[in-house]
Curated annotation (Swiss-Prot):
Membrane-spanning segments: none
Cellular component aspect of the GO annotation: nucleus
Organism of origin: Arabidopsis thaliana (Mouse-ear cress)
Alphabetical list of SUPFAM superfamilies matching this protein: DNA-binding pseudobarrel domain
Keywords noted in UniProt: DNA-binding, Nucleus, Transcription, Transcription regulation
Protein name, per record: B3 domain-containing protein At5g60130
Record-level Gene Ontology MF annotations: DNA binding
Length: 326
């Protein structure tokens, strides 16, 4: 890849032109950029694209053929290429926050226009290739994991999780436009019950429900946080409807997007998902099917949703999902 470094506005940046024939499994940082890396080198870095995708990559120090010290992002560059559907000649800009996060954007080769983040009403831009039926499907801000992530060419250690990545690819590649269309096609003025999308685990008598609620709170990070428990409705598993009673009881408010934290966060990171608020007050988390698929949730499992809010206005920033096998 062609590359360079910019000091505009004192923000460390570097640029690359994506050349498929020269692009390897990992991404080498420009040698001139290494002086901007912190002295205490992080083991992992976050790459966050303007399209909303987030990846966790390992950062390794290696030596080239001429013994020149190099730094390389390993175990994930091929996923970024796939998730962002990079084309030959696309111009990539990486901006470093000085700690452990790289923000990057893409300028398309043909138009030199920057790809921007989609709104909830725009069509999907991110394409992933289906390995099973060779169809292209649009992705919904999901970490689409590449089963071809081989070991590093830089002798920086083996990837012991390659089989896990392959499994995740098969699970997550079909998180597509259907997730959003199901939500958008619900009329705003039609009342929606809590079990229309993900079935609420409310089929219990009240005495037993109180006992179960107390037992389930043991799984929360903070027992005082709002929470609700759901089981999977196999017919409606592509989006999540926040129960109206929870919103009302805790006077919750929602931004345009929230962070989802699931049991696989240490391996694959968090997921950023869009919020759909209808005129009748119904609140959906769009693209929730990715959580169902990558955790292989069964209809016998319980999903305990812990809502983490900030400030006096009870703004929801994060929902943590605890999955109890049934």
């Amino acid at each position: 890849m062609n590359k360079g470094v910019s000091l505009d506005n004192c923000v460390p940046k570097f640029f690359k032109v994506y050349l498929p024939d020269e692009s390897g499994d990992d991404m080498v940082l420009p040698i001139s950029f290494t002086r901007f890396l912190p002295k205490s080198l992080p083991e992992t870095v976050t790459v966050r694209s303007i399209s909303g995708n987030i990846w966790k990559l390992e950062l390794k120090k290696c030596c080239g053929d001429d013994d020149t010290e190099k730094f390389v992002m390993v175990n994930g560059w091929k996923r970024i290429v796939k998730d962002e559907d990079l084309k030959g000649g696309d111009f990539l800009e990486f901006e470093f926050d000085g700690s452990s996060c790289f923000h990057f954007c893409i300028y398309e080769h043909r138009t030199m226009c920057k790809k921007i983040r989609r709104s909830s009403d725009q069509s999907e831009e991110i394409k992933v290739e289906s390995d099973s039926d060779e169809q292209n499907q649009a992705s919904d801000d999901v970490l689409s994991l590449d089963e071809d992530d081989d070991d590093s060419d830089y002798n920086c250690g083996e990837d012991n999780d390659s089989d896990d990545y392959a499994d995740e690819a098969a699970v997550e590649k079909d998180d597509n436009d259907a997730d959003d269309e199901d939500v958008d096609n619900v009329a705003d003025d039609v009342p929606v019950e809590d079990d229309d999308y993900v079935e609420a685990f409310d089929s219990r008598d009240h005495a037993k429900a109180d006992d179960d609620d107390e037992d389930e709170r043991q799984y929360l990070d903070d027992r005082e946080n709002p929470s609700f428990t759901l089981i999977l409705n196999p017919k409606k598993k592509s989006q999540l409807l926040i129960p109206a009673r929870v919103i009302k009881d805790y006077d919750l408010h929602f931004p345009e997007s929230i962070t989802l934290v699931d049991p696989l966060v240490k391996k694959f990171g968090t997921l950023e998902k869009q919020i759909k608020i209808q005129t009748n007050g119904s609140v959906f988390v769009k693209g929730f099917g990715s959580i169902i698929r990558r955790n292989k949730v069964k209809t016998t499992d319980k999903m305990i949703f812990e809502i983490k809010k900030t400030g006096d206005n009870n703004l929801v920033q994060t929902i943590k999902i605890h999955i109890i096998s049934g």
